Amino acid sequence: MNQNPVEEGQKFPLTIRRMGINGEGIGYFKKAVVFVPGAITGEEVVVEAVKVRDRFTEAKLNKIRKKSPNRVTAPCPVYEACGGCQLQHVAYSAQLELKRDIVIQSIEKHTKIDPTKLKIRPTIGMEDPWRYRNKSQFQTRMVGSGQVETGLFGANSHQLVPIEDCIVQQPVTIKVTNFVRDLLEKYGVPIYDEKAGSGIVRTIVVRTGVKTGETQLVFITNSKKLPKKREMLAEIEAALPEVTSIMQNVNQAKSSLIFGDETFLLAGKESIEEKLMELEFDLSARAFFQLNPFQTERLYQEVEKALVLTGSETLVDAYCGVGTIGQAFAGKVKEVRGMDIIPESIEDAKRNAEKNGIENVYYEVGKAEDVLPKWVNEGFRPDAVIVDPPRSGCDQGLIKSLLDVEAKQLVYVSCNPSTLARDLALLAKKYRIRYMQPVDMFPQTAHVETVVLLQLKDK
């Protein structure tokens, strides 16, 4: 039986009490919770119910009766349609406060830990919270008689929103994407049709090294074929000298994953170079690298502040990617070991260590939850562990391994407060949360990165 007093299509007044973990406003109508994208804490609004469930209602904003002083005009022309950003309508100082609150909400919802007893610091923001993303992944679509569009899927949909410019992207990523889009149209290259499963070019991926100026272009295709390849490569080489690597990745799966397993070189180098904290890193097409290079140094500085190192410690860099975090600490410890499931990332990590003259690192391909226990069985016990997992959080097998290994210091770098809270509840059996430091890696969005220092409890 539906206990919700709201009916679909119903319009009603609402006061927004707080904002949720996805950046939406939250209010209560006859004690039933209502989620309203685009509404801000303190606003009095009129909304229309669009989706009614037993325990909650999703509504759209119809009218603002009392506006928040933190409301600003979103500068992006496709902000409401695109779904890539959730907070452009919120003043930046208020975005930073919200992100700290999102961490608190996650602790409240997913653990029995009292967040008022935790030291949750104010969010570290950016001086200029625009044009920060070093990588774009724009889908392609054919419209009308041969016109090619590139853009992002709208929020919770597979409707492509055409994007001519994106104000959170590094300008070169947009410049290259638009140039390639026009080439695809000019040469009539077949564009992937999701419903029919036909066509060739699915996605245009561009990543740039902000410190080096090197840029990589990846054609994500539905087959190994790429018609008019020679002509397009010649035009790209002539017009875009900043593009130093052109790759093709084949993804034939009917899924939302961008990359497939097969990647090969079309022109230039296999990877691009980026610099971070006085180190140099090679980035291959599928390798993970932080999307906001400006804030990455701030993030790693917070990790550095969290760890107390004398130089005699052994350190594990779990989910190591191309080795950035571990190599930043290699000069401060006796040995660093890292693991990652993507073979290309481990190849990059090894090459990066060699390039940076770092000899006290060891890397292995594999899942963290498999590799760490293996190392322990071989007699290696880390004094400190850094985990920087994907949005899904730490695998439960890794949590068990961490609890078994009992490293004195554990730093958790999270990109998802919900899975962070879930993992902290499990780690709390043996670890004490010293503090949590939110870092804004993705201004204008509801995403928040958090550095958490955990210390082994005294027995």
From Swiss-Prot:
Signal peptide: none annotated. S-adenosyl-L-methionine binds at residues 290, 319, 340, 388. The keyword Cytoplasm does not apply. [4Fe-4S] cluster binds at residues 76, 82, 85, 166. One of its GO terms (molecular function) is rRNA (uridine-C5-)-methyltransferase activity. InterPro entries: MeTrfase_TrmA_AS, MeTrfase_TrmA_CS, NA-bd_OB-fold, SAM-dependent_MTases_sf, TRAM_dom, U5_MeTrfase_fam. CDD domains: AdoMet_MTases. This is Uncharacterized RNA methyltransferase LMOf2365_1727. It comes from Listeria monocytogenes serotype 4b (strain F2365).
